Structures are given as C-alpha cells and as structure tokens.
C-alpha cells in the first residue's frame, strides 16, 4: 500500500524539484522493504530550527542535517523527517556532490531510519551508506 508523502517548509523559502518522482521513489523503497506506510512528512528548515529540535528532543548541541521522528506503530511506517537545507548545501560542497544528490541521500536516510535501519555503530553506518547508495541507484533508474 502506498502511503502519503508530503513536503513542507518551516521558516524557509525552498522549492523541491521532482516531487512526484521523489514520492514514487520513497514509496517504492518502502514497498521493496515489504513494509506499509501511512504518512511521511518531510520538512525542510534551516540550521537554527533543526538545532532547536536537536536540543529540545535529543539534548544534542551539535549541528545536524536531519532528524527523524519515527511514529511507526503496528507495522505501519509513519514519521516526520526534518532536514536542514543549509546543512545539506554545506555538506554537498564538503563532499563534492551536487546539492540535489546530497538532498536525495539525506531524504532517503530518514526514510531508512523509519524502516528500522540504524547508524550508531561503525558497522551500522556502513550498512546504512550501502542502502543509501542502492536507493540512489534506484532513483536514477526511475528517472531514466
């Protein structure tokens, strides 16, 4: 079952390109993981907003590009994914990636968290990165 994927801005003026393709991609990733989703909200914001969430909810004082709030219950995938567009832009420069490619990686990173993937240990980080890479390849094939 395809869930609803929605995009919002919080305090910034940002326009996501290819919304329909991104929604299809996210739903395909969930389907391939043999899971069911209801609502996934992706909220684009700035560093300040995400830093405040990070401090309030996780008690972290570091900058981050993404925070995922997982509301999954009874096997139905649901959550809010907050993404700092500022942080993604800066990371794209640091990692010599196109902004859109880095943004896609961060979005799918949040979705993978909703699917139960972790990235706390070095081993988990490698597994997560490999899954992100596989998802990005799928995105390219959907856009071919």
PLM region spans:
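An acidic/histidine-cluster motif and surrounding catalytic segment
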Residues: 1-104, 114-144
